[in-house]
């Protein structure tokens, strides 16, 4: 009997008995069925010369247990890779891996067909309560138990005819400003400045393109928050580690509506709830819509805050904040929106620079390349005061005192002295 025939026999038995592999008892029954099938094969092997060897049967048993009871051999290989920052699955045999330095096609990992790929996605989603991928919900976004972010879709939403998936993992290798300095993400002087900004309660926006290190930097900044502060974190998909790391910190995670009738819980609502939790500081993981105005309102009422936003530069990020504030439903004009955005004090831009075509590595290391103060507005444009110049380890203080210079001195930022 071929390995595939053995697999089909076990799967038929599981379907026949309606075994629920998401339950502990169901997985125990699957374990027994696998062992019973392999025991029968060993007996058949003793009765005649045809058949697999014991070593092959043992290997097949491990594969069946991985695929039917665990996450599967492919999933285990992917999630165990210490250098992979993102997996991009464009079909059963079109799999790409982003190591941070380059994006390359993987040849050693493949699914047999769409059916096995669907089973892989469903097995991952079994770990996430309330998430499923089917005809009713053909696209999902979910946070896996290890913190990875999974986005997936199936046909017809996936127009290439196959299930597709992206699994983004956070593997910059740093959780503090000191560790980011060791990775040349920023200079020691810039780290000291940002730490002082956090301790002084300044309002900070971290910006950059996709996968530029925004979430990692926001996490590191959060670790600089004084222990006596109460912090509330609001996210569309929980990625920040601060509720686990800070003693007086709680986290909210938005929830989409479900086909079972569960109502959606939006990020805008959660920021409103956060204001009623007696916070000293509110952190919104990323501003992309109506939650922007809710955050700006919290800043205007005296709460310190931080967030991240997509932006090709500090100025572009602030323009996006204005745009998002205008789409929030609040009846305000552009100049009024800019006035709300002026509650932001410091903008930090992260980058993941591309190398020239033909280079061995597609990308240079992630780094901060801009730290500015939002000092006001001229008409419909924000007025920016550059505070640091350079990139990564070469970021240097320009000696320009921001409006909150006195607070920075009290927080111990010495270059202002």
Kindly give the residue locations of the regions a language model identified.
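N-terminal accessory targeting/assembly segments
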Residues: 1-133
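NTP-binding/hydrolysis catalytic cores, primarily Walker-type P-loop NTPases
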Residues: 358-417
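Hydrophobic positions on the alpha1 helix immediately C-terminal to the Walker A/P-loop
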Residues: 217
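Active-site phosphate-binding and catalytic loops of NTP-dependent enzymes
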Residues: 70-79, 124-143, 229, 329-334, ...
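Switch/coupling sub-region of P-loop NTPases
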Residues: 202-204, 220-341, 351
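P-loop NTP-binding catalytic core
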Residues: 97-200
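Conserved lysine of the Walker
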Residues: 214
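The conserved Walker
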Residues: 198, 209-210
């Amino acid at each position: 009997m071929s390995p595939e025939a053995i697999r089909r026999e076990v799967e038929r038995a599981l379907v026949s008995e309606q075994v629920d592999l998401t339950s502990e008892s169901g997985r125990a029954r699957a374990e027994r069925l696998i062992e019973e099938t392999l025991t029968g094969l060993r007996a058949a092997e003793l009765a005649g010369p045809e058949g697999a060897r014991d070593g092959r049967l043992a290997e097949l048993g491990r594969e069946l247990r991985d695929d039917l009871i665990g996450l599967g051999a492919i999933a285990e290989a992917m999630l165990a890779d210490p250098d992979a920052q993102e997996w991009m699955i464009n079909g059963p045999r079109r799999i790409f891996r982003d190591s941070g330095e380059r994006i390359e096609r993987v040849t050693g990992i493949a699914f047999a067909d769409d059916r096995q790929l669907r089973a892989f996605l469903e097995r991952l989603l079994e770990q996430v309560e309330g998430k499923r991928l089917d005809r009713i919900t053909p696209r999902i976004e979910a946070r896996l138990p290890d913190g990875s972010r999974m986005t997936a879709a199936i046909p017809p939403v996936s127009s290439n005819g196959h299930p597709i998936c992206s699994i983004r993992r956070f593997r910059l290798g740093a959780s503090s400003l000191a560790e980011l300095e060791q990775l040349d993400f920023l200079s020691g002087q810039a780290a000291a400045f940002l730490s002082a900004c956090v301790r002084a309660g300044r309002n900070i926006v971290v910006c950059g393109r996709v996968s530029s290190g925004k979430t990692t930097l926001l996490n590191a900044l959060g670790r600089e928050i004084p222990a006596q502060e109460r912090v509330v974190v609001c996210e569309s998909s929980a990625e920040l580690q601060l509720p686990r790391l800070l003693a007086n910190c709680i986290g909210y995670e938005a929830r989409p509506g479900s086909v079972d009738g569960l109502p959606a819980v939006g990020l805008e609502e959660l920021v409103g709830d956060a204001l009623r939790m007696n916070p000293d500081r509110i952190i919104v993981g990323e501003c992309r819509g109506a939650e922007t105005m809710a955050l700006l309102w919290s800043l205007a009422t005296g709460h310190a805050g931080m967030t991240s936003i997509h932006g090709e530069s500090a100025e572009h990020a602030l323009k996006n904040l204005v745009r998002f504030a205008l789409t929030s439903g609040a009846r305000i004009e552009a100049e009024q929106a800019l006035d709300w955005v002026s509650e932001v004090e410091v903008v930090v831009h992260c980058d993941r620079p591309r190398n020239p075509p033909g280079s061995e590595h597609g990308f240079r290391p992630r780094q901060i390349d801009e730290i500015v103060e939002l000092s006001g507005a001229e008409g419909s444009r924000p007025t920016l005061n550059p505070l640091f110049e350079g990139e990564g380890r070469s970021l240097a203080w320009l000696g320009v005192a921001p409006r909150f210079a006195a607070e920075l001195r009290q927080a111990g930022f010495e270059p202002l002295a």
